[in-house]
Amino acid sequence: MKFYRTLLLFFASSFAFANSDLMLLHTYNNQPIEGWVMSEKLDGVRGYWNGKQLLTRQGQRLSPPAYFIKDFPPFAIDGELFSERNHFEEISTITKSFKGDGWEKLKLYVFDVPDAEGNLFERLAKLKAHLLEHPTTYIEIIEQIPVKDKTHLYQFLAQVENLQGEGVVVRNPNAPYERKRSSQILKLKTARGEECTVIAHHKGKGQFENVMGALTCKNHRGEFKIGSGFNLNERENPPPIGSVITYKYRGITNSGKPRFATYWREKK
């Protein structure tokens, strides 16, 4: 009985904040962006500090070591746990661990202070003031760059993608923090991304003769194969049948299938 009580308490604490109601992004589709700001979209793990605990986007409590959060503020901040580009798997592994290993590689890159008053810059100023009194290497405020025009936006996107970044976030700095999917904060990527369910593996040929060559997956677009984007380890240990993966693509074929679909990562 004691074991089950302990287990119940563990799950209760892990999911106590299961509905964090964070601000989520819509997609940029040529909307007017005069007076807006932009920043790099970091490919990490969402981190929401509620003033006492660090939570995921789903509201699950993370287990950072004490040194990591020692100088975090007594108010909410929203950001992305991130180390460097193309390290999503490592970031994800670190944040899922209960041992606390590897957190020294991460920072919480903050893009908003949800409960502060004023526009975006005034909200972020509250965090800046706190950091002057309580400096920490584990919080960094993401630079917000004023957008001159759409040409400037796409030039910045090209710069980010040339550095292997995920994309760009463009937002209205005069809008409040909205705890929903908001039309005031938009994501922009050259390659679109979607999810699908793996339904089959196919043996490779040539250099991939002894590993997976491609897989078939299925979503609202139907069934289609994905054979590129995998590294050798992913071909040797492919996403299991029934798992959900994310793929990138560039447009739609006449038959409604994704064009140039490439594997990105397994959703976990």
From Swiss-Prot:
One of its GO terms (biological process) is DNA repair. The keyword Ubl conjugation does not apply. Its cofactor is a divalent metal cation. Keywords: ATP-binding, DNA damage, DNA recombination, DNA repair, DNA replication, Ligase, Metal-binding, Nucleotide-binding. Signal peptide: none annotated. GO terms for molecular function: ATP binding; DNA ligase (ATP) activity; DNA ligase (NAD+) activity; metal ion binding. Its EC number is 6.5.1.1. InterPro entries: DNA_ligase_ATP-dep_cent (IPR012310), DNA_ligase_ATP-dep_CS (IPR016059), DNA_ligase_OB (IPR029319), NA-bd_OB-fold (IPR012340), NAD_dep_DNA_ligaseB (IPR050326). Belongs to the ATP-dependent DNA ligase family. Catalyzes efficient strand joining on a single nicked DNA. This is DNA ligase.
